[in-house]
Regions:
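Short, surface-exposed beta-strand-loop junctions and turns on beta-sheet-rich folds
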Residues: 31, 55-57, 133
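Short, structured beta-strand-loop surface elements
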Residues: 53-116, 121-123
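A short secondary-structure junction signal
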Residues: 79, 128-132
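A short, compositionally biased
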Residues: 18-22, 61-62
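Extreme N-terminal tail/first-helix region
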Residues: 1-18, 138-139, 144-145, 149
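General beta-strand recognition
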Residues: 46-48, 118, 125
């Protein structure tokens, strides 16, 4: 641990990922990066999410992606962030689709969500740290973060 930041092992990262259900999918779409919040589960050492046709599928299917999930433990006032980098693939084999449909994937947004995407990781990394008291940053810093020149 350096400067109050603890680098997490892959096992610790997966354990933390299992404690939350929403993460952010980062993909390249046409000529720019984009980020989408998605509900997900950890399954067989990978990340699985359910979505409908559209930009997420177009940007993710078959591509290298990044996926991030974070959380805060109010009891210890420690926060964590886990990043999974790897290839995203549509789940298309019938037995895999059936198995995926039985996972506890509950999207927040209504609408058809008949596509399952699995991110197979190349790299899993994470950090845990103590959350700084807001007074550390002072009133000026808070004001500047909400205004634009």
């Amino acid at each position: 641990m350096t400067d109050g930041v603890e680098e997490l092992t892959p096992e610790q990262c997966w354990a933390l990922m299992r404690t939350t259900s929403v993460g952010r999918l980062a993909v390249w779409v046409e000529d720019h990066p984009d980020i989408f919040p998605v509900n997900f589960v950890v399954d067989q050492g990978s990340v699985v999410f359910r979505t409908g046709e559209g930009t997420k599928v177009a940007g993710a299917a078959g591509a290298l992606v990044a996926f991030e999930a974070d959380g805060r433990d109010a009891g210890t006032d420690r926060a964590s962030s886990v990043v999974v980098r790897g290839r995203a693939r549509s789940i298309t084999e019938l037995h895999d689709v059936i198995a995926s449909s039985e996972l506890p994937l509950h999207p927040w947004h209504e609408g058809p969500k008949d596509r399952f995407i699995r991110i197979t990781p190349d790299v899993v990394s994470g950090r845990r740290f103590v959350v700084a008291d807001p007074s550390v940053w002072g009133a000026d810093a808070a004001h500047h973060s909400t205004t634009h020149d």
